[in-house]
Amino acid sequence: MRGLSQRVKSMKPSATVAVNARALELRRKGVDLVALTAGEPDFDTPEHVKEAGRRALAQGKTKYAPPAGIPELREAVAEKFRRENGLEVTPEETIVTVGGKQALFNLFQAILDPGDEVIVLAPYWVSYPEMVRFAGGVPVEVPTLPEEGFVPDPERVRRAITPRTKALVVNSPNNPTGVVYPEEVLRALAEMALQHDFYLVSDEIYEHLIYEGAHFSPGTLAPEHTITVNGAAKAFAMTGWRIGYACGPKAVIKAMADVSSQSTTSPDTIAQWATLEALTNREASMAFIAMAREAYRKRRDLLLEGLSRIGLEAVRPSGAFYVLMDTSPFAPNEVEAAERLLMAGVAVVPGTEFAAFGHVRLSYATGEENLKKALERFAQALQ
């Protein structure tokens, strides 16, 4: 056997997927474990969305779809971006993908040449730098600091810009910090994209899960430089349906669709019709989002209050469903801390692959009883 490519051998598997798989395997073996690892809603997909999927099946809507998505969904996506985000886009400036992850993967394949630099704000979602490297680019990390609330410092970002800078990735609300970036910070970053002529990649997958503050889409300021990425997974509890969507300059969107045409062909057709229902039946969908958001807010408050009560520190998140917890009371580093907590019966994600050193990520996309049990075990692990 000749072996694998250097490109694939250099790529790291997703740390979050691996940790969650390990937790699930331990539970299958009967281990009493509270898993705070999953980056997905614990709610079921709303019934009106599932019914739309069943209807598509009954109507025989099971054939190939165009690489950029069915026209009806692209129109609904464009309308969503116009109505909710203030982005004046046409259906031709949108694409439907196999999850938001494929939108990002296709984008980097479409815009990066070998050696192009992409600024990534740390802590970051683990897949950003790997996708950049896979496309031949160079990820350039710019730290955000816990003492600054993990909010980006625009001047620190500015100092990282070079003639090779091709893009800057922003993710607000943020995974793994849960921080919602202030509008003035996003405005400053958009102005840099205009001034230095690079792409602004705005990952807004958690936009509907904000508990304090408001969401702002920087693409309103730099539409010709911004690719806005979103999807059905987090808002509508549709992680397994694998539908993402994005909007941006027509030439970039066309190139992303070309990548799809030579890889996945198109997203699942049935899932696209279900997502169309999620986007167009606003009354039912917004009621579901409001219910889920309130549940997450209560869980966040329960978790933060519990951590504070037992002397553990975390930057207060304003969105998403994650908390980054300081691990110094448990161990010298986040990996040892995660192992100690696993032995105590709680699975968490070490911050290493997020570039969140000295922290672990806790997901509160789980029931309140699980969170209470996890807090009890944290307290026991400190003794």
Curated annotation (Swiss-Prot):
<dbReference type="GO" id="GO:0030170">
    <property type="term" value="F:pyridoxal phosphate binding"/>
</dbReference>
<keyword id="KW-0032">Aminotransferase</keyword>
<dbReference type="GO" id="GO:0033853">
    <property type="term" value="F:aspartate-prephenate aminotransferase activity"/>
</dbReference>
<dbReference type="InterPro" id="IPR004838">
    <property type="entry name" value="NHTrfase_class1_PyrdxlP-BS"/>
</dbReference>
<feature type="binding site">
    <location>
        <position position="361"/>
    </location>
    <ligand>
        <name>L-aspartate</name>
    </ligand>
</feature>
<dbReference type="GO" id="GO:0004069">
    <property type="term" value="F:L-aspartate:2-oxoglutarate aminotransferase activity"/>
</dbReference>
<dbReference type="InterPro" id="IPR015421">
    <property type="entry name" value="PyrdxlP-dep_Trfase_major"/>
</dbReference>
<feature type="site" description="Important for prephenate aminotransferase activity">
    <location>
        <position position="12"/>
    </location>
</feature>
<dbReference type="GO" id="GO:0009058">
    <property type="term" value="P:biosynthetic process"/>
</dbReference>
<protein>
    <recommendedName>
        <fullName>Probable aspartate/prephenate aminotransferase</fullName>
        <ecNumber>2.6.1.1</ecNumber>
        <ecNumber>2.6.1.78</ecNumber>
    </recommendedName>
</protein>
<feature type="modified residue" description="N6-(pyridoxal phosphate)lysine">
    <location>
        <position position="234"/>
    </location>
</feature>
<keyword id="KW-0663">Pyridoxal phosphate</keyword>
<dbReference type="Pfam" id="PF00155">
    <property type="entry name" value="Aminotran_1_2"/>
</dbReference>
<keyword id="KW-0963">Cytoplasm</keyword>
<comment type="similarity">
    <text>Belongs to the class-I pyridoxal-phosphate-dependent aminotransferase family.</text>
</comment>
<comment type="function">
    <text>Catalyzes the reversible conversion of aspartate and 2-oxoglutarate to glutamate and oxaloacetate. Can also transaminate prephenate in the presence of aspartate.</text>
</comment>
<dbReference type="InterPro" id="IPR004839">
    <property type="entry name" value="Aminotransferase_I/II_large"/>
</dbReference>
<feature type="binding site">
    <location>
        <position position="175"/>
    </location>
    <ligand>
        <name>L-aspartate</name>
    </ligand>
</feature>
<feature type="binding site">
    <location>
        <position position="39"/>
    </location>
    <ligand>
        <name>L-aspartate</name>
    </ligand>
</feature>
<dbReference type="InterPro" id="IPR015422">
    <property type="entry name" value="PyrdxlP-dep_Trfase_small"/>
</dbReference>
<comment type="subunit">
    <text>Homodimer.</text>
</comment>
<dbReference type="InterPro" id="IPR015424">
    <property type="entry name" value="PyrdxlP-dep_Trfase"/>
</dbReference>
<dbReference type="GO" id="GO:0005737">
    <property type="term" value="C:cytoplasm"/>
</dbReference>
<dbReference type="InterPro" id="IPR050596">
    <property type="entry name" value="AspAT/PAT-like"/>
</dbReference>
<dbReference type="GO" id="GO:0006520">
    <property type="term" value="P:amino acid metabolic process"/>
</dbReference>
<feature type="binding site">
    <location>
        <position position="125"/>
    </location>
    <ligand>
        <name>L-aspartate</name>
    </ligand>
</feature>
<keyword id="KW-0808">Transferase</keyword>
